[in-house]
Amino acid sequence: MEMAAPNGGGAAGMSSPVNGASAPATPGTPAPLFAGPRVDSLSYERKSMPRCKCLPAAVAEAWAPSAHGCVVEIPAPDVSLTRKLGAEFVGTFILIFFATAAPIVNQKYGGAISPFGNAACAGLAVTTIILSTGHISGAHLNPSLTIAFAALRHFPWLQVPAYVAVQVLGSICAGFALKGVFHPFLSGGVTVPDPTISTAQAFFTEFIITFNLLFVVTAVATDTRAVGELAGIAVGAAVTLNILIAGPTTGGSMNPVRTLGPAVAAGNYRQLWIYLIAPTLGAVAGAGVYTAVKLRDENGETPRPQRSFRR
């Protein structure tokens, strides 16, 4: 058995068929989600030697001209639940603080931030948190996302209560932090339906924008053919787009804790049920629709809990 050089070096090793790039993963192997480098981005600078698996000739020939080859497997790091919950708490706190601060600043300073600025602030916060904490907790930041992924077997149900609990706690802490910084202008950050729309319109607006968000998240987070390295940018762009459209009417929540934390701090619970139920239903629908329409793996692989954000 000979191990292929990572960048196609060595005549006897397995080399990539295109431009000397490192070999792809075994067919059907789930791509890392918001959790670090892919298996084909291996370098000599890694601190530990990855595991090497020999393939029979019939399989190896599909990947390399040699009769036998080795495929590098990098196992997902073992992160304790405590660390995951800590990262999820911090990520949710940061998201709620900055996504809510933008409309509060707008209220306090008479439109200092444009509607696009409000949307971009939330989108950039999401991108930043995914890139900084995704490799630890998966950067769910949203109970609707956690529940939807669990329903589709991309995340273990046993961890759902703990994730939702720290998301709620992070949201409430962010709400009171905002109250301390911006009092008495906190009402500008609470998402409530605009008086010009009906309850049904508000409900379906939140349903649709959350559907769109989870359709994108499920694509970049569970499909092996998606460009996982761009997950943070894609999800942040989806959040920005949704808030640009729904911000003037419902606030563009897409997230029960985006509404809950500021509502608790401000004591404003008007139509709160819309922001708890509509995003959750929209999330399950969006994730489910992408799962139904995506291309299937050739080996017919079924979803596994490890596919959800590699946690």
Swiss-Prot record:
Print the keywords alphabetically: Membrane, Repeat, Transmembrane, Transmembrane helix, Transport
Origin: domain of life: Eukaryota
Q: Which InterPro entries match?
A: Aquaporin-like, Aquaporin_transptr, MIP, MIP_CS
Which Gene3D superfamilies does the UniProt entry name for this protein? Glycerol uptake facilitator protein
What residue intervals hold the motif NPA 1?
Answer: 142-144
- Subcellular location(s) of the protein: Membrane
Tell me the PROSITE patterns matching this sequence.
MIP
Name the segments for region: Disordered. Answer: 1-34
Compositional bias ranges of the Low complexity kind: 20-34
- Sample GO molecular function, one term: channel activity
Query: Transmembrane stretches, by residue range?
Result: 85-105, 111-131, 158-178, 202-222, 226-246, 273-293
Q: What is the membrane topology noted in the UniProt record heading this document?
A: Multi-pass membrane protein
Gene Ontology cellular-component terms listed = membrane
The UniProt annotation puts motif NPA 2 at: 255-257
Free-text tissue specificity from the UniProt record: Expressed in roots and leaves.
Tell me which family the UniProt entry assigns to this protein.
Answer: Belongs to the MIP/aquaporin (TC 1.A.8) family. NIP (TC 1.A.8.12) subfamily.
Q: What is known of its domains?
A: Aquaporins contain two tandem repeats each containing three membrane-spanning domains and a pore-forming loop with the signature motif Asn-Pro-Ala (NPA).
Q: Read off the PANTHER family from this record.
A: AQUAPORIN NIP2-1, AQUAPORIN NIP5-1-RELATED
- Role description: Aquaporins facilitate the transport of water and small neutral solutes across cell membranes.
Q: What's the protein here called?
A: Aquaporin NIP3-1
Taxonomic source organism: Oryza sativa subsp. japonica
Gene that this polypeptide is encoded by = NIP3-1
